[in-house]
Structures are given as structure tokens and as C-alpha cells.
Design a protein with these regions (language model features):
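Alpha-helical structural elements
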Residues: 1, 51, 59-62, 66, ...
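Short N-terminal edge-element motif at the start of the domain
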Residues: 1-57
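Residue-identity detector for threonine
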Residues: 2, 16, 39-40, 49, ...
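Intrinsic disorder/low-complexity segments enriched in polar/charged and small flexible residues
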Residues: 8, 90, 129-130
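Extended aliphatic helical segments
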Residues: 11, 20-23, 47, 54, ...
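Long, low-complexity intrinsically disordered regions
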Residues: 56-125
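A eukaryote-biased signal for long
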Residues: 102, 107-233
């Protein structure tokens, strides 16, 4: 694949699992807004993102763009409105081990961020730009602007489902997450569900295996071939 340079409001088609593509739009770097439009065409014509439903907006890594199959939709119409939420979920400091699918006989252990379940509800304007008067964000951490709730209840499903984690999207986890979004016709995030100690459906298993990183080279190559035959990661 040709390396894709960053251009604000550039509309993209990104492969999730092999042969299934999602529409995304570059915003202020490094954020991409993903839409609930999935297709088996790598380059659908005349896409108008103004008419599409947003799945989620998240920060992505260069690694995600480098190893994903990405196509620029040159005839697409971007939505240039700043419609993205400024409310996010920030995980607690530290890390911990969690066990997914306990009691199933096929448990998967994962190390995830956060020294305890849950997280903070925070305000973070993705469109913010440093200035001489305000070179860093307002919160002392410099990561977000302010804390709205210092400990989101694990039962606050409306909040948990509505807001994104502040972490970065990587390949191939995000690709698998987007594929799951296509199955559920909404935004889902196995990593966030692990963060909040939720029970996981069985079709999240591949995503959890990717999160765990606990496989040998042979298994790793098998997982990668699920996504891209010629992936060189």
C-alpha cells in the first residue's frame, strides 16, 4: 500500500477484517472519525459523510495507518463540522492483569492499563491548539482539560457505552474492533469492556487474544492472515 499522508477532512476507506471496509475521515491529527458505513468495496463512490452516522472518534497511531489497508476516497464529501464529543474516559494510572472468559476452559489473560477497574470521566477538546498563553492543557496532567467524574461507577452503562477511551488506536486491534462494530451495527470496544470488568461475548475472543499478545509467532501469523494476506507487521 502507498503510505497515506495526513490531510484534515480527507475521507478514507480502511480494511477491518479482510474484504470488509469502513469509512473514516481524518480530523485534526491524530484523530479519525469512523462512520457506521461498511462495504465490501475498497473504494466506494460518492460517499457523503455528512449523511452518515458516526461510530466513534479516536486518536490513531502511525502504525495503524502504516499496516492497515487504506484507500483515499477522492470523490467523497467530508463533514467539516466539529461535531465530535469533548468527553472521554481516561483509565486509571498503572496496570493490572485481567482474565477474560473465566470458567470457560479457554481463559485469556491480559495486561491492561489501570490499577483498578473503571476510569475517570474527563473533558478533552480534540480541536484544542496550544498557544503562548496556554501551552499545555488546563489539567495538571497535561493530558486532558478537566475531570468531570473521578471514578465512573462500573454500573454506569450509559456513560461507559457513550464515551471513548483516551488511548491510541493500533493495528490490528482497532481493525478487529471495527469489524465487530459492523456485526453489532454500533460502536463496541472489547478493551473498554475489559477495563470495566464486563462479561464478553464469545465473538470478542479474537480481539481479546490480540490484546493479550500471548501467542507464539505461528499463532501471531495466523491471526494477522485473518486481516491482510500480505501484511508485513
Amino acid at each position: 500500500m502507498t503510505r497515506i499522508s495526513w490531510k484534515e477532512n480527507r475521507v478514507l476507506s480502511i480494511e477491518t477484517r479482510k474484504g470488509v471496509y469502513v469509512v473514516g475521515q481524518m480530523l485534526k491529527q491524530p484523530y479519525i472519525r469512523f462512520y457506521n458505513m461498511f462495504t465490501t468495496e475498497s473504494s466506494p463512490n460518492n460517499v457523503n459523510t455528512i449523511k452518515l452516522t458516526v461510530l466513534f472518534t479516536a486518536a490513531i497511531t502511525r502504525q495503524f495507518l502504516r499496516y492497515s489497508q487504506v484507500y483515499v476516497l477522492k470523490d467523497a464529501t467530508p463533514d467539516i463540522r466539529e461535531i465530535d464529543s469533548d468527553i472521554w474516559i481516561n483509565q486509571f494510572s498503572g496496570s493490572r492483569k485481567v482474565i477474560a472468559y473465566q470458567g470457560s476452559g479457554e481463559e485469556i489473560g491480559c495486561m491492561i492499563l489501570g490499577n483498578k477497574p473503571g476510569g475517570l470521566l474527563v473533558k478533552k477538546n480534540l480541536w484544542w491548539i496550544p498557544t503562548t498563553e496556554q501551552p499545555i492543557r488546563l489539567h495538571p496532567s497535561g493530558v486532558f482539560d478537566e475531570i468531570i467524574c473521578s471514578d465512573i461507577p462500573l454500573t454506569a452503562n450509559d456513560i461507559i457505552d457513550k464515551y471513548e477511551l483516551t488511548g491510541l488506536c493500533v493495528f490490528p486491534y482497532t481493525n478487529e474492533r471495527l469489524y465487530l462494530c459492523s456485526l453489532y451495527n454500533k460502536s463496541v470496544d472489547p478493551y473498554k469492556d475489559l477495563t470495566f470488568n464486563r462479561n464478553l461475548p464469545d465473538n470478542y475472543r479474537l480481539a481479546v487474544e490480540i490484546i493479550s499478545g500471548g501467542f507464539n509467532d505461528k499463532k501471531r501469523n495466523e491471526i494477522l492472515s485473518t486481516y491482510f494476506t500480505d501484511s508485513q507487521i
